[in-house]
UniProtKB/Swiss-Prot annotation:
InterPro entries the UniProt entry points to: AP2/ERF_dom, AP2/ERF_dom_sf, DNA-bd_dom_sf
Region (Disordered): 67-88, 363-439
Molecular function GO terms recorded: DNA binding; DNA-binding transcription factor activity
Primary localisation category: nucleus
Subunit structure: May form homodimer.
Protein name: APETALA2-like protein 4
Family affiliation: Belongs to the AP2/ERF transcription factor family. AP2 subfamily.
SMART domains given in the database record: AP2
Length: 439
């Protein structure tokens, strides 16, 4: 006997083939009523249990909950004082800044971001960006509104340069005017006058510029201060060309003062300036002399220009020089002979003798037997040649030029005691040399 199973829903029917004709059937061994075979039978080979069907919706819900938890668990963005904007705009080149509370417009030009101003509404900032984009990039630039809205503005902007047009846009912004004035950097003081001040200068919050009777004067004072600080790129209330004459005049005055100060610094000596120096004072002083004094000074220069007090160490008896090492050093006979030849070759006359003494004084001092230091040699007296007359003037000029006292010159030149007439002439020459040096 064969049995046939029919599945209807979740109920399985078992019928014997012998009972098919009779129309009777059994369900799990129990007798059932007349059953009619359905036209279409759907069979499920691996039916899903109730427990598995309950697990599926729970896993889907868990996925959604986990994704939502991950989204909420992300760390919030760091907020700084001047950090990212709290709200972005739908317009191109417009940004809302929480710190200022305004919609600010910027445009990029040649790799630099140009500030166009702050506005109360996003639409006003977007229009400022559109005008700047048309000015910088032409009518084919990407703008927020249609090009027909700016037909009149295009005609006006052709008369301005880029810098001037940016200043015009900034003046139209809401952030340009502060306080109770319609000008930038100007406020009404409680005393009734208009106060001008400029902000963010040299690390200070603002710099006070003064009080003015009218609003226009205060605005001009602010413009001048802004131009001095920022140059041509400064944002001013009025056109910068109105201040060109005044700024050029101030720069010319400063250059003139600089030239005068440099001229007084003594780069080149002017005509008529005489330099006086003393052994005890190394400072240099410049004085102007009258024509009469210049003539007298020229005469003194011709007579005893090289006369000055002696700074060389005193020479003891015997023609020796005492150095700082407390040893006596004698010049060689060859050097003494050379110096005597120079003096004698200069001539027997008074003028030629003085010239030779001056040349001897200006020559470099060399040839000491020991050491290597260029100490001033003792005065080498001119030897008395037979048949030659003694010239007291030549001796006094040579002694004054050498820088040694007159007594030592007399001792070196003649062992005998000098006469009274020679002493008086020497005293007079020494007094004249001292007077010339004092001048």
């Amino acid at each position: 006997m064969a049995a046939t199973f029919y599945g209807v829903g979740s109920i399985a029917l078992a019928m014997h083939e012998d009972d098919e004709e009779e129309g009777s059937g059994r369900v799990f061994g129990f007798a059932a009523g007349d059953l009619v075979r359905p036209a279409v039978v759907t069979q499920q080979l691996f039916p899903m249990t109730a427990a598995a069907a309950a697990v599926v919706p729970e896993s889907t819900e868990q996925r959604h909950v986990a994704a939502a938890a991950e989204q909420w668990a992300r760390p919030p963005s760091r907020k700084t004082r001047r950090g990212p904007r709290s709200r972005s705009s739908q317009y191109r080149g417009v940004t809302f800044y929480r710190r200022t509370g305004r919609w600010e417009s910027h445009i990029w030009d040649c790799g630099k971001q140009v500030y166009l101003g702050g506005f109360d509404t996003a639409q006003a900032a977007a229009r400022a960006y559109d005008q700047a984009a048309i000015k910088f990039r032409g009518v084919e630039a990407d703008i927020n509104f249609t090009l027909d809205d700016y037909k009149e503005d295009i005609k006006k902007m052709n008369n301005f340069s880029k810098e001037e047009f940016v200043q015009v846009l900034r003046r139209q912004g809401a952030g340009f005017v502060r306080g109770s004035s319609r000008f930038r950097g100007v406020t009404l003081h409680k005393c009734g006058k208009w106060e001008a001040r400029i902000g963010q200068l040299m690390g200070k919050k603002y710099v006070y510029l003064g009080l003015y009777d009218t609003e226009m004067e205060a605005a001009k004072a602010y413009d001048k201060a802004a131009i001095k600080c920022c140059g041509k790129e400064a944002v001013t209330n009025f056109d910068t060309q109105a201040y060109e004459d005044e700024l050029n005049l101030q720069s010319w005055d400063s250059e003139l003062d600089l030239e005068l100060s440099l001229g007084c610094s003594g780069g080149e000596r002017a005509a008529g300036e005489v330099l006086h120096s003393a052994p005890s004072n190394q400072r240099t002083s410049l004085t102007f002399m009258l024509p009469e004094e210049e003539e007298m000074t020229a005469c003194h220069r011709q007579r005893s220009i090289w006369a000055r007090p002696s700074l060389a160490p005193a020479m003891p008896d015997g023609g020796a020089v005492i150095r700082p090492d407390q040893h006596q050093h004698h010049p060689s006979s060859r050097n003494m002979l050379l110096m005597s030849q120079v003096i004698s070759s200069s001539g027997g006359g008074g003028g030629s003798g003085r010239q030779g003494a001056a040349e001897l004084h200006m020559r470099p001092r060399h040839g000491w037997s020991s050491g290597g230091n260029n100490w001033a040699p003792p005065y080498a007296a001119r030897p008395r040649l037979p048949g030659a007359e003694d010239d007291e003037d030549d001796d006094s000029a040579a002694a004054a030029s050498s820088g040694f006292p007159m007594g030592q010159v007399a001792t070196a030149s003649s062992p005998s005691r000098p006469s009274s007439s020679s002493c008086s002439s020497r005293r007079s020459s020494t007094a004249a040399a001292t007077a010339t040096t004092g001048r």
